[in-house]
Regions:
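Hydrophobic helical membrane-anchoring modules
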Residues: 1-5, 171-239
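Short loop->beta transition adjacent to catalytic acidic/histidine clusters or analogous donor-positioning motifs
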Residues: 5-8, 28-41, 50, 63-66
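Donor nucleotide-sugar binding loop of glycosyltransferases
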Residues: 16-19, 47, 75
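Short, well-formed alpha-helical segments that are part of the catalytic scaffolds
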Residues: 16-31
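Conserved donor nucleotide-binding strand/loop of the catalytic core
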Residues: 38-41, 52-85
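A conserved acidic beta->alpha catalytic loop
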Residues: 44-53, 98
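Acceptor/aglycone-binding surface of glycosyltransferases and processive sugar-polymer synthases
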Residues: 70-85, 102-177, 204-219, 224
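Short aromatic/hydrophobic "clamp" motif used to bind/position activated sugar donors
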Residues: 91
């Protein structure tokens, strides 16, 4: 049986050859420097570029870095695959586009000692207008319909205790498209202790987002159905 570690960094990746080296290097410099007993699990979601080969080169040099490959199934599926492969007592969920800086990870790790989760807040945020509008809509929907109070529930920067990641794997439907938001919902409905931390958000250095405006409507409808279904099955724990 694989040996448990203190921290697993879970990083989905799809066609990120332009940024993956920077993303991995930052984990090594900023995260591994804080937590000695840690690993990085990069899930290549069927990339058609050199993403996997670049990750493999890192893995060949550093045993703490693991590459997991799967057929293209989307960001949500890759995240769930990474959580299944992770061995950490806590999991740090990040993206491979290197938009969120990790220089403040030490503060995140220290805050996690007294919390179930630390959730980032991108401020200021550097994304296309349609994504900013979508984030505001999702925030309002989550607060009003599902009592999820966090400022940035879908942020790709969450440090979460293992028990909550396992709970996500229990309730998320097969092929979940928004597991990161589901995790925020579980934390809120489970009365978890959550710290919100402002994180540095940078303009995208390379590659392109996998969801274009034309596909966004279908994705949002599927995501809403998924959220509503899980919300109906997960009771609210009162504090």
């Amino acid at each position: 049986m694989p040996r448990p570690v203190d921290l697993s960094v879970v990083m989905p990746a799809y066609n990120e050859e332009a940024s993956i080296d920077r993303a991995i290097d930052e984990v090594v410099r900023e995260v591994f420097a804080v937590v000695d007993d840690a690993e990085l699990v990069v899930v290549d979601d069927g990339s058609r570029d050199a993403t996997a080969s670049r990750v493999r080169a890192w893995s060949d040099r550093d045993a703490r870095i693991r590459l997991v490959q799967q057929a293209n199934g989307g960001h949500g599926a890759a995240l769930m695959t990474g959580l299944a492969a992770a061995r950490g007592g806590r999991c740090l969920l990040v993206d491979s586009d290197a938009q969120i800086g990790l220089a403040d990870f030490r503060a995140t790790w220290e805050a996690a000692a007294l919390a179930d989760a630390v959730i980032g807040v991108r401020s200021p945020r550097h994304d296309p207008l349609h994504r900013l509008i979508l984030t505001r809509f999702v925030r309002a929907l989550l607060r009003r319909a599902y009592r999820v109070p966090y400022a940035d529930s879908n942020v790709p920067y969450k440090l979460v205790a293992r028990a909550w990641c396992d709970r996500l794997r229990e309730v998320a439907p097969s092929g979940s498209v928004v597991p990161s938001i589901l995790l925020s919902m579980l934390l809120a409905r489970g009365n978890a202790t959550v710290v919100e931390q402002v994180v540095v958000h940078r303009p995208r250095a390379g590659g392109t987002g996998s969801l274009k405006p034309a596909r966004l409507a279908r994705f949002c409808l599927r995501a809403w159905r998924e959220l509503d279904s899980v919300a109906r099955s997960v009771p609210v724990v009162r504090g």
